[in-house]
């Protein structure tokens, strides 16, 4: 059968990647152009075998080949073709397959883009190849997507999880995976640098754009996941500190610190030790995320598997990677040449301080994720760590980091602050930020220190970079577009989150059909409720006519769906979007008196939160494709 061909190609790819790893690491490739060329060709062959194996798998899903157990368990003939494709990464085995294909893709692009004369390339390719072998063995031995149902396959499949039948799922997981595994490039180059032991090799310049590329994918992936959960799961917010959200946040925080540290290392040969350590940390946290999601040790809407064997394999494999990396780092530590003199209040000093603050955030998230697991293991009781814990740490640390970022704009490389540092941009930005903060405090009658501090810090960054843009427009002074857009996005993100927390409201209403309720400035009229029939589900759809204080009226139609195959019931939100707020309605159960529970949320500036995050990603794209822009 065709599935056997796909299976065989993946096994063949595993063998080729092993050969690349062995010859790259254990033979002197730097003295053999032929061997370097052979390694390049062999890796490419392994990638194409694996890629074609995946393409065959996609074709089998599209054509409803229920001989394949995974497809039978997660697809259905009634599914549109689009969802038959996305069903491949809707569960553990298929998503792991996609993860590995993307990992090999990063290696392939690095393989063909980097010249064979690059001294770090052979060993980097070897490290990537051995990591691929480890994950492929995990896939084939514990999570085999090629298992068949013999002798008689089912006539129809079990269907995909209804909450995953959404267009965003075509983009969110693949983008997130590309971000996770993309950090294999800086990790592999850092380890190759340690293996060579030559401190003069400029590995940082080699990995700069690769690192930013992975960071862009991770940023966009996290943002899309937040948006998807908002409208699909009925949570009505942008972030809920779910454990799997958190394990995506940790590598993003580490990667952000790594990219800044990388810029310092390239510019001044400082923080080189930090940079290597952060490259190891970023990839290790990406692997830790894979372990958390796929080991079954947590309950989450995002988790895939519940198999101790898989968890033990992943834990052992990740432990081997981390232990080997740290051992090499400690072994070569004394030979790494890095200028240790960082002048007070120089740009490097502010970046170093913020790296420490980012480390604090990473540690707090790691503690929040792992402490409940450890507690349950020791005492056989479940506990959870929620938003109050994270907010208590994140708000002051992020505000402090933003203030250091503000001062770093006017600081110089390798120079301490002098009197000229305290110039008009600093005083003007600070004055405008204080004025805005005072206005918010008075106009909205709030005494919340966390909200006011966040608005102050965010606006501080925005006003300072607006000054930079004005300088560019009228004085033609060069500005770094990556830095300006990325950091202004951070400021906008802080301000948007603050106003969202300050202004957003929620209320559960009990409404009869043909009756009206008022909430805030809204009049909500429950017009009707009806039944809709579709190819793979039917639904109860409510119709509401909503009118705001300006007389603008619009219809909202939330649903409760029942999917035929699984019999699962889901809630579909109805959202009216404006520039400043979302009107968000979900329908609950019918009460004994015939009325319906209707949950109404007014979410201010929530779209600006996602816009800010996507703008950060856009800034990264500018850096990746620009020849002039420097990190």
Predicted regions and their residues:
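Membrane-interface interhelical loops and short amphipathic "cap" helices
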Residues: 1-9, 32-36, 59-93, 144-173, ...
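Contiguous transmembrane helix-bundle modules in multi-pass membrane proteins
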Residues: 1-33, 45, 50-52, 66, ...
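A conserved hydrophobic secondary-structure block that centers on an alpha-helix together
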Residues: 11-22, 95-150, 156-226
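Membrane-interfacial helix termini and the short, flexible loops that connect transmembrane helices
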Residues: 22-39, 69, 103-125, 191-207, ...
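Interfacial and helix-entry/exit segments of alpha-helical transmembrane bundles
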Residues: 42-48, 127-128, 202-224, 266-286, ...
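Transmembrane-helix bundle segments that line or gate the permeation/cavity pathway
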Residues: 50-72, 86-107, 138-147, 249, ...
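Extended, hydrophobic alpha-helical segments in both membrane/secreted and soluble proteins
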Residues: 174, 181-191, 203-260, 274, ...
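Accessory, solvent-exposed terminal regions and/or long lumenal/extracellular loops of proteins
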Residues: 427, 491-630
